[in-house]
């Protein structure tokens, strides 16, 4: 179903965005790759072309509405429309709230993780309605629960999920599918090293470990493409985390212990 479809991917220069771009290109999709790093984008374009797809790079920032408008205009001008909008650009956090010295961290997290999606979708939506296409928002399992040391990140992902839930209602009958994706920690991304610490700087190499329950970018991408094909509206990865909302409702004390055990293990 992806052959000759135009797919816009934000945060496409690395990690999950890069993996999605390459996987879609191997299915002969036409990929429009958006990120701030021009050199990294050029490498992903080359990988997409090698995989058999067509790809162009648009350099810009999801937090700047004018950049997002230019992204959509360039995608439409080059390929005649948009079939899938993949909102993947994201920023993480690792700091206790009382350790935060720069409150701009919270503003930045909202601007990237929530408003970054809003900015792009505002300009993409008319094209998606015309193509009866797909909106895919990469949220997080943390948009279902609260996780310590991630207060700003959790808040931004809750905002994104709430936005998508409301938008899904508004788009009933238009043929546009709104899919929210809630992955666990993903290996093969720079989300850990680029996460904000309490002083607003990147965490860097201080939190590199992933436990055995993290998932690979390839696994995550494959599940997302399957969900798009099925026109699903929600995807939780891995599947066992589908229990999280039920534990939150029926056994919150157990969920709380589980969350702390994972965080403590990650922090070692």
PLM features per residue range, with description:
Residues 13-14:
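Conserved glycine-rich cofactor-binding loop
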Residues 27-44:
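Conserved glycine-rich Rossmann-like NAD(P)H-binding loop of the short-chain dehydrogenase/reductase
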Residues 38, 59-70, 103:
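The beta1-alpha1 cofactor-binding region of Rossmann-like NAD(H)/NADP(H)-dependent oxidoreductases
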Residues 92-107, 149-152:
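Conserved mid-core segment of classical short-chain dehydrogenase/reductases
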Residues 121, 156:
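Active-site helix of classical SDR
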Residues 140:
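Residue(s) in the substrate-gating loop at a strand-loop-helix junction
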Residues 173-239:
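SDR active-site lid
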């Amino acid at each position: 179903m992806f052959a000759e479809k135009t797919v816009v991917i934000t945060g496409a220069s690395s990690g999950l965005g890069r993996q999605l771009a390459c996987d879609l290109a191997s299915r002969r999709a036409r990929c429009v790759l958006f990120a701030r790093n021009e050199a990294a984008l050029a490498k992903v374009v080359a990988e997409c072309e090698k995989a058999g797809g067509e790809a162009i790079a648009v350099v810009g920032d999801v937090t700047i509405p004018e950049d997002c408008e230019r992204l959509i205009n360039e995608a439409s001008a080059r390929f005649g429309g948009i079939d899938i909008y993949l909102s993947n650009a994201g920023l993480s956090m690792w700091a206790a709230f009382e350790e935060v010295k720069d409150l701009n961290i919270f503003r930045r997290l909202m601007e990237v993780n929530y408003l970054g999606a809003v900015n792009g979708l505002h300009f993409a939506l008319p094209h998606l309605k015309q193509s009866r296409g797909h909106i895919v928002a990469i949220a997080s399992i943390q948009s279902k629960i609260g996780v310590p040391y991630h207060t700003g990140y959790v808040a931004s992902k809750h905002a994104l999920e709430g936005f998508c839930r409301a938008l899904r209602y508004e788009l009933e009958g238009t043929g546009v599918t709104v899919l929210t994706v809630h992955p666990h920690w993903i290996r093969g991304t720079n989300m850990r090293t680029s996460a904000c610490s309490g002083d607003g700087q990147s965490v860097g190499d201080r939190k590199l470990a992933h436990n055995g329950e993290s998932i690979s970018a390839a696994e995550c991408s494959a599940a997302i493409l399957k969900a798009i094909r099925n026109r699903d509206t929600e995807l939780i990865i891995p599947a066992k985390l589908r229990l999280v909302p039920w534990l939150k409702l029926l056994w919150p004390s157990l969920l709380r212990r589980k969350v702390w055990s994972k965080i403590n293990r990650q922090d070692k």
